[in-house]
């Protein structure tokens, strides 16, 4: 009788914990929302994205703020940000940027930067 009770308890535990494990496993490598887009680290990444875009495109965008964002843990962290910037005309526009950051290697790379449109992420 005791072994049946132990077996049922273990089986119940597996049934309860298995969905939690599967849920956590599905998030590994997935995108997670950034709860505080005013965090200095997030703002620094946003400023880097605009600055790097300006260097590559010989543009003159001026960073304003990070509107929203997500992170993805890879070999480092991918930041997918919607940033507001203007090109000096006084009109703020949103841009989508992806930055790969590996702070322990002092490595940061702008992977993508484009005008935001309603059909995309964020």
From Swiss-Prot:
Keywords: Glycoprotein, Plant defense, Protease inhibitor, Secreted, Signal, Thiol protease inhibitor. It comes from the Eukaryota. GO terms for cellular component: extracellular region. One of its GO terms (biological process) is positive regulation of seed germination. CDD domains: CY. A motif (Secondary area of contact) lies at residues 72-76. It is found in: Secreted. One of its GO terms (molecular function) is cysteine-type endopeptidase inhibitor activity. InterPro entries: Cystatin_dom, Cystatin_sf. Residues 29-117 form the Cystatin domain. Residues 1-26 form the signal peptide. The record marks 29 as: Reactive site. Glycans are attached at residues 36, 109. Its main location: secreted. Specific inhibitor of cysteine proteinases. Probably involved in the regulation of endogenous processes and in defense against pests and pathogens. Belongs to the cystatin family. Phytocystatin subfamily. This is Cysteine proteinase inhibitor 5. It comes from Arabidopsis thaliana.
